Amino acid sequence: IDNILIVVPPSLVRYPPSRVESIEGNSVTLNCLARGNPRPHIEWRKEGLPLTLDPRFEIRPTGELFIQAVRMVDYGMYRCRATNSAGGVAASTRLVVTGSHIHPPLLITLVLMTSHCDWFKIHRQCG
C-alpha cells in the first residue's frame, strides 16, 4: 500500500490587525499563525523587503514577529506570508510608532491682585 500525502494549502489562524500602534521604547508582537500540510514556512517583510538583521527583531517558531524596544524607524507596513508546496497566504499590518516624550498637562495658577475699588471699576462704577 502506498502512503498517501494529503497536501493542504496554508490558512492563517491568527494574523495581525490592519493597524498596530506602539509607543517608542515599548515592545510589540505581530501575530502570524498558519496551518497547512506540509507545515507552512513564515516569512516577514517590511515595505516589501526582507527584514534586516537587527537583533531587536525575532521571528518566533509560532510565526510571530517580536520587535523589542520599538523605534520611530520601525514605522511602516509589515507583511507576513505563509507558504508551502500547496500555495501561500499573506496578511499585512501598518505599525504606527508614537513618541515617548509625552508631556504631562501643565497647570498654571493665575493670581490677580486687585483692590476692592478696581473690582468695582470692572463691574460697576467706583465712587
Model-flagged regions — what are they?
Residues 1-127:
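Immunoglobulin-superfamily
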